[in-house]
């Protein structure tokens, strides 16, 4: 459970701090903010299925350790750039792409590990995990709301340290070797295609997938762009207002 919060808290910080840096600090336009926000999600769109495949084929504990270490680098690098007064729009794009890529591999490994840890208490574990996730996100939002007063550098350092702590926490987990694979499953790409077909054709998972796509398309994307712009241009607000 501590491993879950070690990634969710930094993502909560990023959710507020990243658009604040783009829209408030750099005063970028709405279209450039949209591109920046898209960059945080774009790697996951193409890599999340490969992340799931990797989690099925390799030790999930090792994946979590390695990618948590890697995930600590972008925030630390961005903090260094800000300390050197070298912050730029393209530096933020690079940060977004790196974090999006890392997240595409951490999430499947974390979810797979959760299934192993839960055992026969899966429903209870999922409920507790959801509660921790919401709580950790709120903590991240609250921390990032102080960006106007303390600046971004301390928050980026905090972001990096918490993510790195996830690697240390994962060291305490038992090894999670991959489950036996079906020799008739075919190539990795065919396995991904088969998984997509199962989800799309499922009377339960298919509608849920459509609903999530609709929410992301018609609400999520516009919200993460319009909210910071409205806060900045209409209300003259900053990080604390964005976090609300």
Please place each PLM-identified region on the residue numbering.
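Alpha-helical transmembrane-bundle signature of multi-pass membrane transport and export proteins
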Residues: 1-244
């Amino acid at each position: 459970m501590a491993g879950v919060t070690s990634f969710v808290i930094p993502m909560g910080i990023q959710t507020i701090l990243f658009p604040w840096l783009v829209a408030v600090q750099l005063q970028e336009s709405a279209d450039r903010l949209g591109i920046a926000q898209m960059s945080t999600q774009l790697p996951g769109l193409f890599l999340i299925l490969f992340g799931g495949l990797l989690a099925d084929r390799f030790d999930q504990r090792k994946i979590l350790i390695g990618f948590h270490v890697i995930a600590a680098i972008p925030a630390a690098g961005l903090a260094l750039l800000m300390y050197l007064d070298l912050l730029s729009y393209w530096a933020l794009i690079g940060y977004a792409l790196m974090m999006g890529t890392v997240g595409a591999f951490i999430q499947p490994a974390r979810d797979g590990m959760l299934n192993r840890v839960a055992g026969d208490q899966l429903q209870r574990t999922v409920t507790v995990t959801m509660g921790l996730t919401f709580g950790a996100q709120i903590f991240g939002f609250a921390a990032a709301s102080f960006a106007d007063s303390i600046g971004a550098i301390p928050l980026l350092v905090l972001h990096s340290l918490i993510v790195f702590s996830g690697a240390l926490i994962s060291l305490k987990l038992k090894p999670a070797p991959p489950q036996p694979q079906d020799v008739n499953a075919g190539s990795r790409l065919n396995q991904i295609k088969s998984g997509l077909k199962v989800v799309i054709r499922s009377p339960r998972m298919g509608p849920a997938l459509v609903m999530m796509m609709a929410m992301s398309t018609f609400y999520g994307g516009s919200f993460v762009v319009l909210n910071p712009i409205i806060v900045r241009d209409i209300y003259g607000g900053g990080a604390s207002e964005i976090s609300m």
